[in-house]
Structure formats: structure tokens, C-alpha cells
């Protein structure tokens, strides 16, 4: 039942989730206790491992026992066995425990003091929780169910997956929106909720609970990645703000009270999502992480994995690459776009690792978040803090110079100075070359649509050249160094990724993505008329400006580590990977992670070079604070307005009569019955009951590459001419008919004809449920 099994069901579901999460954190702590990770990072990695186990272990047993309680009990037993084995094999020595930070309360206080991002995370997490609470089928006083603006669409699809997987228990699962078709959408983001729903949680609780853990993993994974990359809390803090509180310059189009009022009353007329003004770079929290579960759960794996892999490359330990490979291999059926983005990131990082030996080595404090008492004690000598480059509370010019030198040249060990100089030059101009290339392509495309027709070919050629260059560097590396060094790091990682990912890709992804509308030419993402640079300037806003400056403000070392965004942007701007061109933003936003990191570091460098001088006087401080406030306003105001719109949005999703009808359907029908309904995206039958329908909404099925058109036509025929469509009722094995104002408003329903094929068995207001007569199937 979508209402759940009361307190017992809720406790069982929460307990099941907590057991996997807690055991995963235990495993992470045991496996990483001897590594130079903070406990925060260890528990983050462990929580990711726990969620991966919750997503995958029931499915492994579901092949034999279907998606049943038996499969889930066996999955839990497997997790317990894994915990016992890890606890038995992995011992944390007393020395390693003593060397570890956060053993005392003072260390935790220092953690919060040196990483103020916790405050922003808490505020943003509260916003996320409130939106989920008010948007997830909230029961109204009249019995109807309500939602918000961003969740009005996709949430219905996710509900249909969650309820059908749990109720029908067939594995591999099929589309309840199009029976007979294998569910090839990355459904592990929903099966995790199906597990909790199966335990007895209400649909609302099963939907929300895993998302709360996932958003914290996204927040922490992003911050750890930037912190490891730059080794500075302030850079990670600014990057976090630029990414999660993004807004662009769309606010300039809302220049009077009437337009501002429409932000909070119209459907999708916000400063970050306004088609008429070509505003397409949506607010991350509102339009990516709240409504798009695959993106949320994909990033919950991807961001911590990137931070973890960063460290693995630096220390070159086989165990870390093994752990990273297993996690990466689990990604395709959680979020395919994240898996593709990870592949491009790893390709660039591998190239950098082959050419510059110690590029990923960062100060030890970065890995411990500057909280270890030992590292902190060593940073103070003769009354000055050398680690932060501050003397008596002031940033010294010598510390800045030494930091810049070490950042740009200290990571070139093992590579020739000529190679380093050449790579330093190209990385500083790569962004401008790319912008010039795409601007010229846009001008050519406007006259003859060359890029729209041949973008895929251009992309393939570019990627092929990159792969050839990577192969060349690989050969040179193997000629000069031991192959074992590479085989037991990147080699193991690649093998494990292929072992775990290929079965998923062949079983689910490739079969559905083989249509003509998937991998194809498409130029310039969602730009509808603006000049190339202007489009991204007004959509990205301050991060784009700072990115332009970063080429000359940021060290070459940091520019190189951030280079994956160049490859991601190149690929995503020339080809589309599914029927909805707009969905390339799921790749572009991963590229934006690196853009925000570089933009944040550029801002820090600007302050240290020019702003620190003015900080010494009261007037100077006021000026710096005012300038910082203005920059924050420009960067975030569009995002805040969009978040405010989401905060107050409220729409009826299912009427009270529809909800009551669904309760009746759950009680009186079997999970495998097929019900005839309209193809509306918010049809309550597949979402609340998990029953299969003849055809779901084209807004879902088309973008999944499914051939639904005949089913859609047959649905209309069965409503408009039921007496002459008896063969269709038999063909689709329709057991029940659902009739409401949705169906009356969509089709010219022949009610008299329906009486010839079915009988009314339930009715309330405008909603009725009909049972197809047995004689139809004779």
C-alpha cells in the first residue's frame, strides 16, 4: 500500500536502510584506517559503499528469487558476512589510530572552525528537506495529493518505477508504463526506494529517506574533491557556493515588480529557467537534485569517488584503486551520464599522470582537513604559521610567492622541463582556443547547419585524436618506467570497471540506446539564438567570468587537474546522447564542478594579489567586504529567486477521488493486472499502485527511446470505440478500466460502449473503476 504498513513498516524500512548505511561506514573505517584520510572522508566513503550494497545486493539475489523479501534478507546476510570478513582481515594498529585526527572533542571543534562550509551545508540541507517534505505527495485536507513545481513531472515516473518494482517483484523489471519492454532506464536510483517500500514504508517515506543521505554525500563529495585539489578550505568554500547556489545573470530580465511577482506565480518563469530569454542553465538544487533522482544518486557516487580517486592517484596504492574500480563499475545503472563523465575525467587524469608524475600530490593537511594535531603542531615554528602562509594574521608576499611556485612547478617530478613548459602553455590558452573554435562553428552552422549535421563526426575525430595522443604517451611511459607501476594502479581500476560495468551496459543500456535518436549530431546544447560566448556568460554568470581569468591567475598544475571540463564540454557541445538534447546538461554540470573550482581559485588569487593590501585599513576592509557582497549577490541572486519560487510552489497532483480509487485498486486487484488509463504524465494508477497500464506518457517514453506510438493509438481506440476494440482488450490483456476527468478531457469517451465490455465496480465523484467482462477473453 502506498500509505505503508504503519509504524511497524516505517521502523523496519528505516532499520534496513540504517543497517546498510552503518555497516558500510564500518567497512569504510576499517579499510581506510591506515590511510591519510580524515574520519569524515572515511565515513563518507563508507556511506557510499553502504548505499551501493543496498542498491546492488538485493538485485544479485533477485535474479534467482525475484525482487522479493527473500532476496532482501539474503542481501542483508551478505552485507553482514562482508562486515565480518573486513573486520577480521583489516586491523587498525594503535599507531595508526594515534596518528588519526578527530580523536578528541577539540579536533572536531577545529574541523568546524576551519571548514565553515558546514553552515552553508546545513542551511541548504534544510531547504532540501523542506522541499521534499512539501513536494512529495503531500496529503491535503480534502484527501488530494500535492507537489511542487520541479517535481510535478518526473516524480510521477519515479513513483511508477518504485511501486511496480516492489509490487510486481518481477526481475529484471519491465516498464509498467509500457508492458513487455525491459526497464532500461538507470533504475537503481528507484530500486533503493522499492526495497524500503517492500519493507512496509509508505511511498512518501521510501521516496524521501534515501534522498536525504544522497544529498549529504553530494555535498561532502564535492567539498572534499575541491579541498584535495587546491588544499585550501576557502577555495573549496567558494567553489561550493558557486556550484550549489548557482544563478547566472538571468535576474537582469526581471527589472520591475510585476516580473518579479511572476517568478513566484508562473510555471517555470524563473531567472534560471526561462525559455523566452534563453535561460537554460538551471539552479542545481531546484532543478537537478530535487526532481532528478538518477542525477542525485549518480552524483552521490561520482563526487566522493572523484575525491577518493584523486587521493589514490597521489599515493598509488593498489587497494585504493581496487575500491575505486568497484564503485565506478557500479555506476551505469545508477546514472549513465555520471559513468560517461567519469570515463572522460579518468582519461584526462590518466594522461596527466603519465606525463607529470606527482601532479596529484597535495599537502598532507588537505587529506586530513588540517585537523590533525601533529600536522598542526609542525605548521607552527617560531610563532608563525607556515602551512597557511600567514604571519601575525597577515598574508605575506613571500608565502604567496612560494605557494605559487610550489603549485606550478613542485608537481613536475619525473617529467622533462621542456614537456612541462609546453603543457603549461597549452593549458593556459586551451579555454580561449575552445571558445574561438565553437564561436566560429556557430557562425558556420547558422549559414549551412554544418555542425548540426556533422557534429558527431567532428566529436569522434577529436576524441580519436585525444585517444591516439593518450596511447602515444602510454607507450613512452612504458618504455621509460616499469609496467607494474601502471598495471597495479590504473590497470586494476580499468579491469574492475569493465568487469562490473559491461554486463550492465549490454543487458540494459546498449539495447535501448541503439536507436537513431540517441547518439547523434547536435551542436551547442540548448542555445536558441544567442552568440556562443554571450549564451554562457548570461547563463553561468560570475563563474564564467572567473573562468576566463583563471587561465592567467591559477597555477598551471591546478589548470591541468581541472582540464577534464574541456573534454566534457567538447563532447557535449557536438553530440547528444539521448532524444532529449537538453539532457546533455547532466554532462555539462559535471564539467561545471571543475569550472567552479577554477573560478573559486581565481577569486582567491585575485584577493591575495590585490585585495590583501587593502585589508589592513578600516576603509579597505569595508571596500573588500562590499565588493565581496556584490560578487555574491551577482552570483547567487538568480538562484535564490528560483529557490524561493520552489519554496512556495504548490500544485495538485492527484485528486481526492483518484487517491481513493487507487486504494481500492491496490486492495481489489493483483499487482500483475493491466489497467486501461489515459496517457497523462500524472495518471495516478501506475504511480500509486504500481499496476501496469497500456501506455504511459510520451514525455517519458519518447525520451527513453521506446516505440510507444501504436500503444498510444490503441488506448484512444479502446476509449472511443470500446465495443469494436474487443480484440485490443485481449491483445493487451486489459483487466480493468480507469475513467476520470483526465480520460474525459483527453478522449471522446464512449461510455455506452464501455458498458458492453466492462462493468462498473467502484465509483466516486468523477472517478470510476471498471472490470472487463470475462467473456471478452473467451
Segments from the language model and where they lie:
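Active-site lumenal/periplasmic loops and adjacent helix-entry segments of GT-C-fold
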Residues: 124-301, 336-340, 651-652, 679
Amino acid at each position: 500500500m502506498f500509505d505503508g504498513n504503519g509504524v511497524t513498516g516505517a521502523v523496519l524500512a528505516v532499520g534496513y536502510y540504517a543497517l546498510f548505511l552503518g555497516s558500510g561506514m564500518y567497512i569504510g573505517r576499517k579499510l581506510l584506517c591506515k590511510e591519510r584520510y580524515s574520519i569524515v572522508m572515511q565515513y563518507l566513503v563508507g556511506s557510499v559503499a553502504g548505499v551501493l550494497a543496498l542498491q546492488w545486493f538485493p538485485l544479485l539475489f533477485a535474479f534467482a528469487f525475484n525482487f522479493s523479501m527473500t532476496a532482501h534478507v539474503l542481501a542483508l546476510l551478505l552485507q553482514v558476512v562482508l562486515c565480518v570478513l573486513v573486520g577480521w582481515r583489516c586491523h587498525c594498529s594503535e599507531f595508526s589510530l594515534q596518528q588519526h585526527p578527530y580523536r578528541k572533542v577539540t579536533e572536531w571543534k577545529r574541523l568546524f572552525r576551519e571548514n565553515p562550509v558546514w553552515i552553508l551545508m546545513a542551511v541548504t540541507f534544510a531547504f532540501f528537506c523542506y522541499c521534499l517534505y512539501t513536494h512529495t505527495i503531500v496529503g491535503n485536507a480534502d484527501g488530494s495529493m500535492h507537489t511542487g513545481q520541479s517535481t510535478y513531472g518526473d516524480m510521477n515516473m519515479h513513483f511508477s518505477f518504485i511501486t511496480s518494482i516492489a509490487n510486481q517483484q518481477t526481475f529484471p523489471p519491465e516498464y509498467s508504463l509500457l508492458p513487455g519492454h525491459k526497464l532500461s532506464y538507470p533504475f537503481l536510483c528507484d530500486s533503493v526506494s522499492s526495497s524500503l517500500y517492500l519493507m512496509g514504508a509508505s511511498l512518501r517515506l521510501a521516496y524521501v529517506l534515501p534522498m536525504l543521505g544522497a544529498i549529504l554525500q553530494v555535498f561532502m563529495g564535492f567539498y572534499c574533491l575541491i579541498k584535495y585539489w587546491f588544499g585550501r578550505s576557502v577555495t573549496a568554500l567558494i567553489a561550493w557556493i558557486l556550484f550549489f547556489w548557482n544563478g547566472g545573470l538571468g535576474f537582469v530580465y526581471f527589472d520591475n515588480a510585476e516580473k518579479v511577482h511572476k517568478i513566484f506565480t508562473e510555471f517555470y518563469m524563473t531567472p534560471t529557467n526561462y525559455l523566452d530569454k534563453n535561460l537554460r542553465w538551471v539552479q542545481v538544487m531546484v532543478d537537478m537534485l530535487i526532481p532528478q533522482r538518477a542525477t542525485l544518486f549518480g552524483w552521490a557516487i561520482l563526487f566522493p569517488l572523484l575525491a577518493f580517486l584523486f587521493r589514490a592517484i597521489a599515493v598509488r596504492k593498489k587497494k585504493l584503486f581496487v575500491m575505486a574500480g568497484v564503485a565506478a563499475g557500479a555506476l551505469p545503472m545508477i546514472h549513465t551520464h555520471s559513468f560517461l563523465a567519469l570515463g572522460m575525467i579518468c582519461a584526462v587524469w590518466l594522461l596527466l599522470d603519465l606525463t607529470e608524475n606527482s601532479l596529484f600530490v597535495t599537502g598532507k593537511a588537505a587529506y586530513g582537513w588540517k585537523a590533525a594535531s601533529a600536522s598542526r603542531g609542525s605548521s607552527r615554528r617560531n610563532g608563525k604559521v607556515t602551512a597557511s602562509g600567514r604571519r601575525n594574521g597577515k598574508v605575506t608576499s613571500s608565502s604567496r610567492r612560494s605557494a605559487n611556485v610550489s603549485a606550478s612547478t613542485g608537481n613536475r617530478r619525473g617529467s622533462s622541463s621542456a614537456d612541462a613548459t609546453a603543457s603549461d602553455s597549452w593549458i593556459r590558452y586551451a579555454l580561449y582556443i575552445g571558445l574561438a573554435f565553437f564561436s566560429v562553428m556557430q557562425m558556420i552552422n547558422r549559414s549551412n547547419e554544418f555542425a548540426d549535421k556533422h557534429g558527431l563526426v567532428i566529436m569522434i575525430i577529436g576524441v580519436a585524436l585525444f585517444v591516439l595522443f593518450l596511447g602515444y604517451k602510454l607507450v613512452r611511459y612504458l618504455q621509460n618506467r616499469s609496467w607494474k607501476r601502471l598495471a597495479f594502479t590504473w590497470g586494476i581500476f580499468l579491469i574492475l570497471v569493465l568487469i562490473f560495468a559491461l554486463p550492465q551496459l549490454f543487458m540494459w543500456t546498449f539495447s535501448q540506446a541503439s536507436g537513431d535518436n540517441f547518439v547523434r549530431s547536435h551542436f551547442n546544447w540548448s542555445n536558441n539564438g544567442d552568440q556562443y560566448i554571450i549564451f554562457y556568460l548570461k547563463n553561468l554568470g560570475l563563474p564564467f567570468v572567473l573562468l576566463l581569468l583563471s587561465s592567467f591567475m591559477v597555477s598551471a598544475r591546478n589548470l591541468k587537474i581541472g582540464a577534464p571540463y574541456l573534454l566534457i564540454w567538447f563532447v557535449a557541445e557536438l553530440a547528444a546522447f539521448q532524444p532529449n538534447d537538453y539532457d546533455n546538461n547532466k554532462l555539462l554540470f559535471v564539467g561545471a564542478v571543475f569550472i567552479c573550482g577554477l573560478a573559486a581559485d581565481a577569486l582567491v588569487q585575485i584577493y591575495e594579489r590585490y585585495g590583501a593590501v587593502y585589508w589592513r585599513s578600516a576603509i579597505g576592509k569595508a571596500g573588500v567586504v562590499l565588493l565581496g557582497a556584490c560578487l555574491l549577490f551577482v552570483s547567487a541572486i538568480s538562484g535564490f529567486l528560483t529557490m524561493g519560487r520552489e519554496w512556495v510552489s504548490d500544485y495538485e497532483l492527484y485528486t481526492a477521488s483518484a487517491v481513493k480509487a487507487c486504494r481500492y485498486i491496490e486492495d481489489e486487484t493483483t499487482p500483475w493486472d493491466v489497467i486501461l488509463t489515459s496517457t497523462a504524465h500524472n495518471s495516478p494508477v501506475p504511480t500509486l499502485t504500481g499496476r501496469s497500464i497500456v501506455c504511459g506518457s510520451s514525455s517519458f517514453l519518447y525520451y527513453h527511446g521506446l516505440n510507444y506510438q501504436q500503444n498510444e493509438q490503441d488506448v484512444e481506440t479502446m476509449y472511443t470505440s470500446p465495443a469494436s476494440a474487443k480484440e485490443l482488450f485481449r491483445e493487451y490483456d486489459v483487466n480493468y478500466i480507469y475513467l476520470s476527468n483526465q480520460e474525459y478531457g483527453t478522449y471522446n469517451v464512449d461510455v455506452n460502449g464501455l458498458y458492453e465490455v466492462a462493468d462498473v465496480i467502484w465509483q466516486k465523484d468523477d472517478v470510476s473503476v471498471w472490470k472487463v467482462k470475462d467473456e471478452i477473453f473467451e
